[in-house]
Amino acid sequence: MLADVVGPICESGDFLARNRKLPSLRQGEFIAVMSAGAYGFSMSSRYNSRPLAAEVMVKGGEFELVRKRETYHDLIRGEKVPDFI
């Protein structure tokens, strides 16, 4: 199957690959983005109220969760609604 691999944000630049040949996928399956480099944590964003994704470090056959997926509560933890609203 030939497909564009896109992210969850409604922006024209939110894509990981265009016209990429992929195996047949079913709804709910995941795609791993390997060799993403060291920019995941430093360049991640909460833009559009999106919690930060989990990160997994992979080396050879070993892997480790290095950052848990952020929850909605994590996302709004530092916010406060003023009393006058």
Where would I find each of the regions flagged by the language model?
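Charged (often Lys/Glu-rich) extended helix/loop segments that serve as interaction or gating elements
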Residues: 1-85
